[in-house]
């Protein structure tokens, strides 16, 4: 009975397992979510430790606890850096279930943990450490790119370079700010637009022109004015900048996808796993003729792998308004939903191939166990069938997208309003900020609302 309960528990997706925490976040009860995170026993195993650090760090940030939040993001960074594969556990996970692997994060999750560290530091007014954290964000993306064979992937983070430019900008280092902004522009043009459909932020264009004009890069000013069809504008006298980040909604969650493959015997010890509808054929080496017959006798094999499901954000766009009703539109800087889908799509064949290999290894183990002990073989056969489960773990408190703007406000205490627009309403959130001469004020805000789930094509679905 204990075994059966354990297997039923394992069948729940990662999203279902933390339903209480998610409900607290959805209802805006961040204090309760923080308390539940402390009691979440399923976070304690090492294989889920990184997710505990990431989710706890995000909730603490939402609660305005920047210092405590960064302690968890530092732990997350060290965990990823120090992780070394446990080959015994790794072998067991191939045979039983990928969920037994230690989770070290999707590539974009490893990159974006440094976004939160950076935002925490800028909100604390610590620009030097913010610069270090942002450079770690870029270094992480470069390190991940070194391991990618197919370069037509999410491999460079445009928003990281954009954010780096904002920090240099705030420090008065306009030369390095311009370089960072220009690097960001190139990545938006070369990677983000064709791969993710993310447009170049209008604010980035304005910042490139402004910093170029500030350091008298006349040729660059003329070049980009023509390219952007904009005029370079400097900071107005008596004003100082406010950089406002809006984390909109919540990023996608992982669910399980599965398809059936038909098995066909091949030559030289191989069995072909074929799905005609998807146009897929995976030749897997099985071994002797007896083992091949056992695998092909099954005829149809179910294979599971993870897929993302969108949490459709309630708010579609937003503007910032000052006390004089000047309007500053927020641009999408990072479409995390699109990045998540692209990252998983890029390795779909690898995921399916590993799932098929896992099935073949399980069948070999069952056959070997039956030779030794019929009862043990039967038990392993049941375990093999029950354990065919995709790894649905992911960092579930990332936003759907990161949006931002730069507003120029008069020196002194100011009241600003963030207006977020849905299909049928506008919500207003008020902020009081102290604008100081010669300083950049950084603010960040999260909206959590979303309107159900959708597949990668935008079709609405019922997840659970």
Task: Report residues per predicted region.
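TPR/TPR-like (Sel1-like) alpha-helical repeat modules
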Residues: 70-81, 121-122, 135-139, 169-193
């Amino acid at each position: 009975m204990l075994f059966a309960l354990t297997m039923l528990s394992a069948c729940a997706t990662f999203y279902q397992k933390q339903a209480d925490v998610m409900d607290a976040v959805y209802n805006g009860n961040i204090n309760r979510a923080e308390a539940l995170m402390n009691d979440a026993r399923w976070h304690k195993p090492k294989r889920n430790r990184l997710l505990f650090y990431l989710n706890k760090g995000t909730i603490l940030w939402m609660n305005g606890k920047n210092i405590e939040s960064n302690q968890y993001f530092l732990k997350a960074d060290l965990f990823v850096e120090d992780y070394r594969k446990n080959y015994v556990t790794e072998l067991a996970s191939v045979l039983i279930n990928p969920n037994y692997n230690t989770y070290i994060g999707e590539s974009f999750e490893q990159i974006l943990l440094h976004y939160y560290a950076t935002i925490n530091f800028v909100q604390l007014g610590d620009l030097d450490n913010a610069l270090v954290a942002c450079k770690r964000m870029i270094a992480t993306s470069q390190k991940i790119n070194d391991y990618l064979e197919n370069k037509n992937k999410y491999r460079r983070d445009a928003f990281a370079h954009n954010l780096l430019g904002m920090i240099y900008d705030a420090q008065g280092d306009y030369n390095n700010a311009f370089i960072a902004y220009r690097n960001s522009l190139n990545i938006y043009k070369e990677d983000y637009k064709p791969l993710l459909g993310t447009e170049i932020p209008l604010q980035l264009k304005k910042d490139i022109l402004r910093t170029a004009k500030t350091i008298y890069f006349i040729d660059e000013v003329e070049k980009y004015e023509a390219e952007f069809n904009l005029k370079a504008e400097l900071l107005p006298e008596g004003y100082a900048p406010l950089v406002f980040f809006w984390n909109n909604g919540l990023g996608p969650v992982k669910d399980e996808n599965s398809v059936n493959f038909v098995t066909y015997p091949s030559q030289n010890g191989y069995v072909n796993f074929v799905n005609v509808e998807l146009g897929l054929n995976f030749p897997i080496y099985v071994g002797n003729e007896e083992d091949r017959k056992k695998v092909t006798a099954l005829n149809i094999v179910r294979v599971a792998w993870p897929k993302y499901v969108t949490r459709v954000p309630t708010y579609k766009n937003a503007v910032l308004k000052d006390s004089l009703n000047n309007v500053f539109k927020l641009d999408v800087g990072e479409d995390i939903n699109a990045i998540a889908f692209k990252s998983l799509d890029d390795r779909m064949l690898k995921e399916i191939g590993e799932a098929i290999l896992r099935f073949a290894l399980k069948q070999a183990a069952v056959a070997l166990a039956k030779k030794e002990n019929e009862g043990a073989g039967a038990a392993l056969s049941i375990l093999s069938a029950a354990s065919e489960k995709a790894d649905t773990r992911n960092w579930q408190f990332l936003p759907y997208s990161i949006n931002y703007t730069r507003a120029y406000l008069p020196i002194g205490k100011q009241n600003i309003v963030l207006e977020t627009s849905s299909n049928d309403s506008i919500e207003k959130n008020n902020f009081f900020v102290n604008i100081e001469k010669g300083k950049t004020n950084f603010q960040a805000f999260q909206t959590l609302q979303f309107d159900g789930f959708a597949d990668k094509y935008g079709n609405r679905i019922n997840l659970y």
